[in-house]
Amino acid sequence: MKFSAVCLPFRPFPAVWLACKISPGKESRKASEGREKKSKFNKLKFKVMHSKIFQITRTRVDKDNYLNEDTLMQGDDSFFDYCAEIDDEERQYHIDNLVNNILPKGMFEFVSDDTIRYNGGAAQWREDFVADIRSRAEAVTPESVQEWIGPVYQLEKFLKNPLDTAYWFYMDEEGLQSHAEQSYEFLRQVCEFEPGTLLYIGGVIDYHF
């Protein structure tokens, strides 16, 4: 007996479940990692829901204290659904991208693959940051103040993340802190450093949000 094929106008339930699952167990994370490696960390596929967290400190961190997939709070009450380890190739790609394309131009340079030098530039960054705050604040009016994703929301986002990046930062040298920071907190601390200060990149992990 032959059966005719039936074309469903929607995905079968298991596919939808996999796409929507928020906090997978260890096995699910391994499967996710495998898929990412096979696709050579396809930027188009993962740029929306995945990004990276960098451990950057003023002293070189022992590998036992590297940021890893279990360091941060994840799941409920956390920005991160889950975190995962990455391979060396992906790690270096994102370190290069951070220094060359994300951080303020000229403020940092490579000394080695996992060491960067702060060259100065805090005064200029502070001036630019304040000017941007004032410009964005001008868009807040009595008429726009209650807009759902309006100028108030955009200003709040900018104050936390002036680099407008999905990268997060972890500056604890002992690996005890259970949360990461957005780009404002990283730059705020950098502005306290003397030009020439060396910064060391420890653990770099993937996160899903």
Task: Annotate each language-model stretch with its function.
Residues 3, 10-13, 41, 46:
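Aromatic (phenylalanine/tyrosine) cluster motif
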Residues 29-48:
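Short, Lys/Arg-enriched N-terminal segments with co-localized hydrophobic residues
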Residues 42-82, 198-209:
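Short, extreme N-terminal segment that most often corresponds to the first beta-strand
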Residues 48-49, 169-209:
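Acidic, proline/glycine-rich low-complexity IDRs
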Residues 74-173:
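Low-complexity, serine/threonine/proline-enriched polar segments
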